[in-house]
Structures are given as C-alpha cells and as structure tokens.
Amino acid sequence: MNAGLTYTARSVLDQRTQPGAVTIRSFTETSKTVEAIDLAISVLERLHDKGLDDEGVASARALILGQFPTRLETASSLANMFAFLEQHGLGRSYIDGYGSTLEAAAAETIALTIGEVYPDPDSLVFVLIGDANAIRDDVAKYGPVTEVSITEPSFTPPPPQ
C-alpha cells in the first residue's frame, strides 16, 4: 500500500487441519493492475528468499496481536473461535497463551513456516475482476487467461423463487 497502487491489500491464510488456500487480495484502479500484481509477487518472492527482518517480525507480531482481541468481541466471533479451537483440538490455553506463543516464535521458525505455507510465486492462480478489455493482454504474461463474464450463470445467484 505504500506504493500507492491499491486502496487496500491483505493476505488471508485459510487455517484448516490440512493445507488450504493463501489468498492475496487487493483493489486497484484498472491502469495499475499489472503493477500491483508485480508488487505482490515481488513481496512473495522476497518472503521466500529472505524471510522477514527483525523490523518485519516485530511489525507482524504487533499487528497480529493487536487484531486478536477482535476475534473474541462478539457472539459470532466467539462462536468462530470455539469452532476453530474444536477443529484444531485446542483448548483455552491457546487463547491464554496466544501472546506469549507469538512473542516466542523465532525468525527461523517463521522462515520455515513461510516456505511451507506460502505458495511458490511460479505456481500462483489469479482471479481478476475488472475491465477485461483493458487488462487482458497485459495479464497474459502471468499465464493462460480464461475469461468468464460476470453475467454467466455460475457468477450470478439464481433468482428468488
């Protein structure tokens, strides 16, 4: 976001008991699509090649720890947390020890986790929603392009009955 290419950017790790999806999401103006994708790929490559430096680790810890209480604020978020604990066979100690566990994560462990969890930049799948005429040729550099109109039945929920 510091490059001014996006309105927002985030990555989401689908936490399951088996490997899941890692999603990088962003919203950018059409003319900046390729530049934003290239930047995301370069960040992913840097994570694989160099991991996080001490400043990056501290920043990530602060962000993750700061967001954790919001996972316990509402009835819905508590229900999600209970489901998460059950799914992963965790108890209350997960919540009680979350901060200390996060603080104890060593840079080497973080680097190993990045290598195991985040996809290789050469094996990415892109889902782009936007002006196909404006980005079609430019995004072809990432691989074969399949276009689906937003009016296709698979994109549109069935009408209410």
Report residues per predicted region.
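An aromatic/glycine/proline-enriched structural segment found at the starts
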Residues: 71, 128-161
